[in-house]
Amino acid sequence: MKLNRRMGRYLQDLRSREVGAAFAPRRPDVRIVETGGCFLLGGFLEKPHLSAADFPDQTGLECSANKLRMEAMFDARIASSCPLLLLTAGLVTARTVSEALSRYPGRFNVIVSYDGESCAVRFHKIRAGQRWLAEDLEGYVDEGVLVFEAGTAVPFPALLSA
């Protein structure tokens, strides 16, 4: 697992909070489908809004098509008044995505990005010669970025363990 300093600060802030509310054990419904060598969200396949021809490689397509925006899961007033709720939802969603990817052969990157106002979870298959994230995560100065590997026989990062 890799993360930049900004994400480290967000996670430290999240850990320092005490929330006096019960957490619902229900997780987001994530359905992943393999098609044409790509691993895509089922919802994207039902309503595609991107074309593979618009991307230089499969990894770029996957990262754009497989973007789950946490603010779409909540009423706008809740999201704006409790922004760390979005990061919490992102971490829960990342674990759910990781579990779904463990059913497929190969290795995948699961990426969580959070800027204090919005949070997104993305994923892509790890392929030789294809990158989506910069090697140095500190270059993402406007957002916290966390990335970890998922797939068969890849353990969950301790941060995501129940």
PLM feature spans:
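N-terminal leader/targeting segments
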Residues: 1-70
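Extended hydrophobic/Leu-rich segments
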Residues: 14, 77-79, 100
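Alpha-helix capping and helix-coil boundary motifs
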Residues: 16, 79-82, 141, 146
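A short linear-motif detector with a strong N-terminal bias
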Residues: 18-19, 48-50, 89-92, 102-103
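Alpha-helical context
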Residues: 46, 50, 73-77, 86-88
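A short, surface-exposed helix-loop junction/capping segment
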Residues: 64-84
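A short, highly charged nucleic-acid-interacting micro-segment common to nuclease
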Residues: 80-94
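Acidic, proline/glycine-rich low-complexity IDRs
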Residues: 88, 95-162
